[in-house]
């Protein structure tokens, strides 16, 4: 069996909104009824029925503009895939927090932070523009 490949040097049919008139017709090899319809097309178009006009259109074009502009449901697959990976990542992070990471160091405790801040104020750290400049040492409270 010999497989015949398509000749890509010839124009190919493609439905595109930005290029509405393709160089070749959609149907390349016409059947006997389609050939008869093409002969009938050469006469007056008023003698053609609506079904015949649609059939002639379908010989030339695969889709109408309304069919090309119709939305697809591909976005649902993309959103579903993204949500799957986000959920999987959340599960991995929860597993890591439970089994891999240890408890937080004591320096993250609110009491520790308060003691450290008080120590920095007592040492008058950065008295010009920093933390100590915003503390009122006479009233023992933050400046307003």
From Swiss-Prot:
Residues 100-144 are mitochondrial intermembrane. It is found in: Mitochondrion inner membrane. Keywords: Acetylation, Membrane, Mitochondrion, Mitochondrion inner membrane, Phosphoprotein, Transmembrane, Transmembrane helix. Its main location: mitochondrion. The chain crosses the membrane at residues 74-99. It comes from the Eukaryota. The modification Phosphoserine is found at residues 31, 33. InterPro entries: Cyt_c_oxidase_su4, Cyt_c_oxidase_su4_fam, Cyt_c_oxidase_su4_sf. The modification N6-succinyllysine is found at residues 4, 35. Pathway: Energy metabolism; oxidative phosphorylation. The keyword rRNA processing does not apply. It is a single-pass membrane protein. Residues 1-73 are mitochondrial matrix. Belongs to the cytochrome c oxidase IV family. Component of the cytochrome c oxidase (complex IV, CIV), a multisubunit enzyme composed of 14 subunits. The complex is composed of a catalytic core of 3 subunits MT-CO1, MT-CO2 and MT-CO3, encoded in the mitochondrial DNA, and 11 supernumerary subunits COX4I, COX5A, COX5B, COX6A, COX6B, COX6C, COX7A, COX7B, COX7C, COX8 and NDUFA4, which are encoded in the nuclear genome. Component of the cytochrome c oxidase, the last enzyme in the mitochondrial electron transport chain which drives oxidative phosphorylation. The respiratory chain contains 3 multisubunit complexes succinate dehydrogenase (complex II, CII), ubiquinol-cytochrome c oxidoreductase (cytochrome b-c1 complex, complex III, CIII) and cytochrome c oxidase (complex IV, CIV), that cooperate to transfer electrons derived from NADH and succinate to molecular oxygen, creating an electrochemical gradient over the inner membrane that drives transmembrane transport and the ATP synthase. This is Cytochrome c oxidase subunit 4 isoform 1, mitochondrial. It comes from Gorilla gorilla gorilla (Western lowland gorilla).
């Amino acid at each position: 069996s010999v497989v015949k490949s398509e000749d890509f040097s010839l124009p190919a049919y493609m439905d595109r909104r930005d290029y509405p008139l393709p160089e070749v017709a959609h149907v390349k090899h016409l059947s006997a009824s389609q050939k008869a319809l093409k002969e009938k097309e050469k006469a007056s178009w008023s003698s053609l029925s609506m079904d015949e006009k649609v059939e002639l259109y379908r010989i030339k074009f695969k889709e109408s503009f309304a069919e090309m502009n119709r939305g697809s449901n591909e976005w649902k697959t993309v959103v579903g895939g993204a949500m799957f990976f986000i959920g999987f990542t959340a599960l991995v992070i929860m597993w890591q927090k439970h089994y891999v990471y240890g408890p937080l160091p004591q320096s993250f405790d609110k009491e520790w932070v308060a003691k450290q801040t008080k120590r920095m104020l007592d040492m008058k750290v950065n008295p010009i523009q920093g933390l100590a400049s915003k503390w009122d040492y006479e009233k023992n409270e933050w400046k307003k």
